[in-house]
Amino acid sequence: MLYVFVKFREGKNPTPSKTTHNVMIEVLWTVIPCIILIVIAVPSFKLLYKEETIPKADVTLKAIGYQWYWGYEYPDEKIAFESVMIEDKDLKPGQPRLLATDTKIVVPVNKVVKVLITSADVNHAWAVPAFGVKRDAIKGRINETWFKVEKEGIYYGQCSELCGIKHAFMPIEVHVVSEDKYASWLIEAKKKFAMEENNSSRKVKKILNKEKM
């Protein structure tokens, strides 16, 4: 911009050029960007392919979006439960508002977790920013993603697809723990959240959730 101001100032160019087009320049500014885009595209396609390729999973988790909470299943362990946001009046010290849930996802550290994502009603999106994960939850379709967390801790996410009046009240809470703690949790979870026993309770919770609307 400064170069143009100096180069084509009135003092140096009392009679301005009236050139309307230049074929060579037009060809160059069309061809050169195309070449650059092609060069960038080759490694980009490789990265996109790798991004969609899921490594062999150590843990498989299924996330089902409902209006307005998440349901989870560990199909290999026959575990199923719902995860509902804790209301303000029920929060305990240290629990973040609009993010804490009554039942948490638990996964082991340094393990590949494959997530199968779907919906039971409208479109939702399962997103945990710290994992770099966001996938749409669509009824009748299963989308896949994965993550591998290298640090123990509590990670939060939310539904990222506008899904109704309580869209903002669909948090995701993931506890990443050691393998020993995960094994202990599995023992308790298999007793508390056995998939067959949870079918009726899940239907009841759905009904109650709708009645609160």
Feature annotation, model-predicted:
Residues L2-M213:
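Non-transmembrane, membrane-proximal soluble domains of secreted or membrane proteins
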